[in-house]
Design a protein with these regions (language model features):
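N-terminal auxiliary interaction/assembly segments of multi-subunit proteins
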Residues: 1-187
């Protein structure tokens, strides 16, 4: 949501971002689902031993770049590898997206999302073994009249400590509230 507001202000057009699904897949299944060429932004999950992926369609990247450089988002192009100039423009957008993601996660855990690199071919990205389970959060990104896909991918081993801490917080919250709720129910 925060990133959507940022894009609205930068692109000066209507932008909406919504979660379409949250899935657990084998890493190999996720990689096979990515078309080539693509825009695969790899980032470090500082505070864990893991690395994550923000994968966006090249059409979305091209649409953002075109709009930022004075064009409109109504043009559609065939997917292609983005140029070094387009990569430089998108890097700032992606770094801002990662900062917004970090803000969104702050209520759950203190994680730092640090941009690492861009890959355009899925075969060159190895953040986990093929048989590792990953969490994939899929988003629908609407820019103007066009809809694009964006995915976040986290290996489960990178989130284990976070999930353990989250479960402990939920349990302690429940145990603190339980006696109070019991009294209310007895009255």
């Amino acid at each position: 949501e925060i990133f959507g507001y940022y894009l609205v202000s930068k692109l000066q057009t209507i932008v909406s971002i919504s979660v379409t699904s949250v899935d657990q897949l084998f890493y190999s299944e996720f990689i096979l689902s990515i078309s080539n060429p693509s825009c695969i932004y790899v980032f470090d999950l500082e505070g864990t031993d893991g690395t994550g992926i923000m994968e966006i369609s090249p059409q979305l990247a091209l649409s953002i770049v075109e709009r930022l450089l004075g064009g409109n988002t109504e043009t559609t192009r065939k997917p292609r590898t983005i140029t070094p100039i387009e990569q430089a423009v998108m890097r700032g957008i992606i770094e801002h997206a990662l900062a917004d993601l970090q803000t969104a996660w702050r209520s759950i855990a203190e994680l730092n999302f640090q941009y690492s690199r861009l890959e355009t071919e899925a075969d060159f990205v190895q953040i986990a073994p093929s048989s590792e389970i990953v969490v994939v959060i899929s988003f629908d990104v609407n820019v103007g009249m066009h809809s694009y896909l964006m995915n976040l991918c986290f290996p489960t081993f990178a989130l284990e400590d976070v999930l353990t801490r989250l479960n402990r917080q939920q349990i302690s919250t429940l145990s603190v509230q339980s006696p109070h709720r019991m009294r209310e129910n007895m009255a």
